[in-house]
Design a protein with these regions (language model features):
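Compositionally biased linear targeting/interaction segments
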Residues: 1-298
């Protein structure tokens, strides 16, 4: 399976490299006339089809399961382009705690799970409650901390589009954001958690009564044999926890396949560098990949 995945990745990257060259290099006269920064932006634009090819090849190899042992998750990639190199790495956003669960009408289980995650990460529980209030439908019960700033902001409540929104939460420092960010995502409300790619803190948070060591045992089991289904996860987690494992913090929670991914792209051209994050959706039924959001990184 590893060899098959590797071959599929090579095929995907070869096809994608041709696309990259076509998009980014095609008109050499035009490229010669533009600045290096503009040229790097073109190279980064070409990263989307590269990532799409890799994710589509993974879906074609097996659409029933996504896990951390697959090539897209374990290997970065780089493609030489003209005078530069485009590199990137893909992550599964469904392996993270979906903050928008906190905006549902029945958010009690999600709120409890999020508080457990905050504690497991060593963050102030008051910060966790402020995040929960930020996403509460209708907005925070006490909006004064938002209005009483040097530059007042609004907090309408409800779902958020990106986790960058967390920077508006009262008490959210850059250090706290950097600690929390790798474990959370902002996905559509009904999106489930892929238990094959979730971190130990996230798994411990969504399993009431589980300690971090229990989640780490699950990760060891998962490394040996990824969970084949939500039922398989519940059964194996139940054995470790010695109790029945329920659905989790939101409707249709536990899954073993993913739709939502992110990719960090980096291009080097001569002595210059430029980076971008892109967010993507991959159709469960067709494997078609669509870019949904992008952000240039400093």
């Amino acid at each position: 399976m590893v060899l098959l995945n590797a071959l599929l990745l090579v095929v995907a990257m070869t096809a994608a490299a041709n696309t990259v060259l076509s998009l980014a290099v095609g008109d050499t006269t035009r490229l010669a006339a533009i600045h290096g920064g503009d040229q790097m932006a073109l190279y980064l634009d070409a990263g989307t089809p590269l990532v799409s090819q890799v994710l589509t090849a993974d879906w074609e190899a097996g659409a029933e399961i996504d896990h951390g042992g697959e090539i897209w998750a374990t290997e970065g990639y780089s493609v030489p382009i003209d005078r530069g190199v485009l590199a990137g790495r893909i992550t599964d956003l469904q392996g993270r705690f979906n903050l928008n669960w906190l905006a549902s009408d029945n958010a009690g289980p999600a709120q409890a799970a999020f508080e457990r995650l905050i504690r497991l990460l060593g963050l102030d529980i008051r910060l966790g409650r402020a995040v929960t209030e930020h996403l509460r439908p209708g907005g925070p019960a006490n909006p004064a901390p938002y209005y009483n700033r040097a530059l007042p902001v609004t907090a309408p409540g409800g779902t958020i589009a990106t986790i960058a929104e967390l920077r508006r939460v009262p008490g959210m420092t850059e250090a706290a954001f950097d600690t929390l960010a790798p474990h959370v995502a902002a996905l559509p409300l009904g999106t489930g958690l892929n238990v094959n790619t979730a971190s130990a803190p996230v798994l411990a948070a969504v399993l009431p009564g589980a300690a971090l060591r229990d989640a780490e045992k699950l990760l060891s089991e998962r490394a040996a044999a990824p969970f084949a289904s939500a039922g398989d996860f519940a059964s194996r987690a139940g054995t470790i926890l010695r109790r029945e494992v329920a659905a989790g913090p939101a409707p249709r929670d536990f899954r073993v396949v993913s739709e939502y991914f992110a990719a960090a792209l980096d291009v080097a051209l001569d002595d210059q560098r430029q980076s971008r994050m892109i967010w993507l959706h991959r159709s469960l039924s067709s494997g078609t990949v669509t870019e949904t959001y992008r952000m240039t990184l400093p």
